[in-house]
UniProtKB/Swiss-Prot annotation:
Tissue-wise expression: Expressed in the left-right organiser (LRO) node at 8.25 dpc.
Pfam families assigned to the protein according to its UniProt record, in alphabetical order: CFAP300
Keyword Coiled coil: no
Designated gene of the protein: Cfap300
Listed name of the protein: Cilia- and flagella-associated protein 300
Compartments reported by the entry: Cytoplasm; Cytoplasm, Cytoskeleton, Cilium axoneme
Taxonomic placement: Eukaryota, Metazoa, Chordata, Craniata, Vertebrata
Family the UniProt entry places it in: Belongs to the CFAP300 family.
Top-level lineage group: Eukaryota
Subunit structure comment from the entry: Interacts with DNAAF2.
GO CC annotation: cytoplasm; cytoskeleton; motile cilium
């Protein structure tokens, strides 16, 4: 059987957790930032519980069972490609793709190199540059050059492995925003928002013997296909359209972070 194709019996059962709220996306200061970044009304998180033990190697069976579950189908939210309104999955999922996303970072010191390499000044202001395009993004500062331009002088400040980290992915998504994104002049709002969302989604525990903090969540970037093609997170693929499944095997919860690129709420 090919990876990502349905298994007889499914194995997992899910329950929607509507009362699990994510303050990192709803606090007034954060919604103000998301509005500026053209992401408000197009990004959300939802939580579901599941009934069995989970191991990362089971990710394909887990994700397929998720999309087949009768408690998921009427509750999992996505943006309609035609109306731009929130809706639920209207087609049967035939195949899934779940890519492992490393999640090991426990500190925002991960981004200190942006200061060390003079991408951001000591004052926190992002260093400007001459405008250029990395389709569809306007690059007007050194931060976006580091995020997008592989041939830029300082692109190697973050290694390929570090760029795969969930914390880096969150940070990059916030920096790039939606289609009418108004960029920040300073770094702090991006770092603060990425940190809050990361802490809201990812579970940690203290090791009983060493007392060290450990991340217990597994993270997957997910796509689902119906008989026509990609149906989730959106039929229109874009670097800024994504869905991450953050699985806590101890609590048996999965947090789903979703965003669909477009024009966010302005009011």
């Amino acid at each position: 059987m090919a990876a990502g194709e349905p298994r007889d019996g499914g194995g997992y059962y899910f329950r929607f957790l509507p009362h699990r709220t994510f303050s990192s996306l709803s606090a007034r200061e954060i919604t103000s930032r998301l509005r500026q970044w053209s992401m408000l009304g197009r990004i959300q998180a939802q939580a579901f519980s599941f009934d069995q033990t989970f191991q990362p190697y089971q990710k394909d069976d887990f994700v397929m069972a998720f999309f087949k579950d009768p408690n998921v189908i009427p509750n999992l939210q996505l943006l309609s490609d035609s109306s731009g309104q929130w809706t639920t999955l209207g087609s049967e999922v035939k195949k899934i793709e779940a890519i492992n996303v490393p999640c090991t970072q426990l500190s925002m010191s991960f981004f200190q190199r942006l200061y060390d390499e003079n991408i951001v000044r000591e004052s926190g202001h992002i260093v400007k540059c001459l405008d250029s395009f990395c389709d569809p993004f306007l690059i007007s500062d050194e931060l976006r050059k580091v995020l997008l331009m592989e041939d830029s002088e300082k692109y190697e400040v973050f290694s390929p492995v570090e760029r795969e980290e969930f914390l880096f992915c969150l940070f990059k998504h916030l920096c790039l925003g939606g289609s009418l994104c108004q960029y920040e002049d300073v770094l702090k709002p991006y770092l603060e928002t990425a940190k809050l969302i990361y802490k809201d989604l990812v579970s940690v525990r203290k090791h009983p013997r060493t007392k060290e903090i450990q991340i217990t969540s597994s993270v997957f970037k997910v796509k689902a296909y119906d008989s026509v093609g990609v149906c989730y997170p959106s039929p229109k693929e874009h670097e800024q359209t994504f869905s991450y499944f953050v699985v806590d095997p101890i609590k048996r919860h999965v947090n789903v972070l979703y965003h669909c690129y477009g024009v966010g709420h302005m009011a």
